[in-house]
C-alpha cells in the first residue's frame, strides 16, 4: 500500500493578502455596476494603518474608491486600530492610471480581428500571456480535493463564530491547514489540523485550543477521518519540523517512495534554522535571484543547486535494494 500526505491551507477574511483581494475585487464590482465594459487592473497593498490602491483602470464610471476601501475593511471586522488597521481611520493612498495604450490596442483589436475574422468572440484580444491549468476530482461534492475543502470550511467556521459573537475574542485574521493521508490514492484519514487565529490579547492559548477542538473541528471534519494519531495545532507558529515530506517519482524509482522519503528525512534537515544554515541564507545573495529564476543558475553556485549528497543517497538506495533482494531470496528458500 502506498501512503502519501497532501496539505492545503485557507486564509480568513482578515488575512492581509485576502483583505487586499477583497478590496481590489470590491473596486472591480463597483466599476462593473456602472460600466460593464471597463478594463480594470487594480492592485492593493496593506500595512499597519495604510492601504495603497494602484494599477491601471479605464472606465467611464465614477466610483468613490476610498469609501469602498473603508467599507470593506470595516465589513471584514477591522474596526479598531488595536487590530492593526481601522477602516474608519486608516490612510488610503490612490495611484491609478489609465490602461497602457499598447495593451489597449491589443485587447480592443485582436490579431484574429486584424486578420479579417468577423466572429464576435474573436474581436477581443488577451491583455497578456497566460498559463491556466486545473482539474476536477471525486473526493468532495464540489469536485475539489478534500484537503482544500476542509481547510476552507474550517476557516469559514471560525469566521462564523467570530461574527455571531459566540467567540467574541476572535479577530479577523487567521489561517487553517489540513493534512490528509491517502492510501493508494484514496482518502484514508486526517493526519494533522492547524488553526491559527488572531485574538484578543486577554485570552490564553488553552482557552482558544479548547474552543477550536470543541466548536470548530467537530463541526467540520468527519469523525471517521479522525483518530488518536491525528495531530492538532492551534496557533502553532514556531513548530520547527515539517508535518510531512512527499515524494512522487511517477513510477520511475527502483525503490519505494516511502523509503525515499525516509532517506530524505535522514539526510536533509528541513527545519528552518537548518535550511538557513545549510543554504547560507544570511548572506546578501537575493538581488541576483530576482530575475531569471532561483533554480538552474550554475553561474551563481547556489548551495541548493549542489548535488553533493547524490552519491550518498545512491549508495544507501543500492544497499536497501540489496537487502530487499536478499530477504526475498531467503523467503523463497524457506518455501
Q: What are the roles of these predicted feature ranges?
A:
Residues 50-56, 191-199, 243-249:
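Short, hydrophobic beta-strand segments
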Residues 51, 164-186, 234-261:
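A structural-propensity feature for long, helix-poor, extended segments
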Residues 236-335:
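Internal helix-turn-beta structural module
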Residues 7, 74-232, 291, 295-321:
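Glycine-rich, mobile lid/loop segments that gate access to catalytic sites or pores
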Residues 40-59, 237-240:
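Short, charge-patterned binding micro-sites
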Residues 1-41, 317:
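N-terminal, positively charged regions that mediate nucleic acid binding
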Residues 5, 12-18, 44-47, 233-239, ...:
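Structured, hydrophobic secondary-structure cores that serve as assembly/anchoring elements
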Residues 64-85, 113, 192, 207, ...:
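A glycine-rich helix N-cap at a beta->alpha junction
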Amino acid at each position: 500500500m502506498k501512503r502519501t500526505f497532501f496539505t492545503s491551507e485557507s486564509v480568513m477574511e482578515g488575512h492581509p493578502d485576502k483583505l487586499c483581494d477583497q478590496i481590489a475585487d470590491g473596486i472591480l464590482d463597483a466599476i462593473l455596476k456602472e460600466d460593464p465594459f471597463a478594463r480594470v487592473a487594480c492592485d492593493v497593498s496593506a500595512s499597519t494603518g495604510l492601504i495603497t490602491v494602484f494599477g491601471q483602470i479605464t472606465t467611464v464610471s465614477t466610483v468613490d474608491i476610498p469609501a469602498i476601501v473603508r467599507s470593506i475593511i470595516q465589513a471584514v471586522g477591522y474596526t479598531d486600530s488595536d487590530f492593526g488597521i481601522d477602516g474608519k481611520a486608516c490612510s488610503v493612498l490612490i495611484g491609478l492610471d489609465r490602461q497602457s495604450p499598447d495593451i489597449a490596442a491589443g485587447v480592443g483589436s485582436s490579431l484574429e480581428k486584424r486578420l479579417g475574422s468577423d466572429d464576435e468572440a474573436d474581436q477581443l484580444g488577451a491583455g497578456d500571456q497566460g498559463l491556466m491549468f486545473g482539474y476536477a476530482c471525486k473526493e468532495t461534492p464540489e469536485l475539489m480535493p478534500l484537503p482544500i475543502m476542509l481547510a476552507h470550511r474550517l476557516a469559514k467556521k471560525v469566521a462564523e463564530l467570530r461574527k455571531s459573537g459566540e467567540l467574541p475574542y476572535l479577530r479577523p485574521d487567521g489561517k487553517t491547514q489540513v493534512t490528509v493521508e491517502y492510501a493508494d490514492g484514496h482518502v484514508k484519514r486526517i493526519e494533522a489540523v492547524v488553526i491559527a487565529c488572531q485574538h484578543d490579547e486577554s485570552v490564553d492559548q488553552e482557552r482558544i485550543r479548547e474552543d477550536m477542538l470543541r466548536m470548530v473541528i467537530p463541526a467540520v471534519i468527519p469523525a471517521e477521518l479522525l483518530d488518536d494519531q491525528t495531530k492538532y495545532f492551534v496557533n502553532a507558529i514556531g513548530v520547527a519540523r515539517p508535518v510531512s515530506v512527499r515524494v512522487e517519482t511517477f513510477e520511475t524509482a527502483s525503490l519505494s517512495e516511502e523509503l525515499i522519503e525516509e532517506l530524505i528525512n535522514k539526510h536533509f534537515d528541513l527545519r528552518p534554522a537548518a535550511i538557513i544554515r545549510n543554504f547560507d541564507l544570511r548572506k546578501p545573495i537575493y538581488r541576483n535571484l530576482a530575475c531569471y529564476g532561483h533554480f538552474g543558475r550554475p553561474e551563481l553556485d547556489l548551495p541548493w543547486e549542489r548535488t553533493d549528497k547524490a552519491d550518498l543517497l545512491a549508495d544507501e538506495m543500492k544497499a536497501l535494494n540489496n537487502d530487499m533482494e536478499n530477504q526475498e531470496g531467503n523467503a523463497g528458500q524457506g518455501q
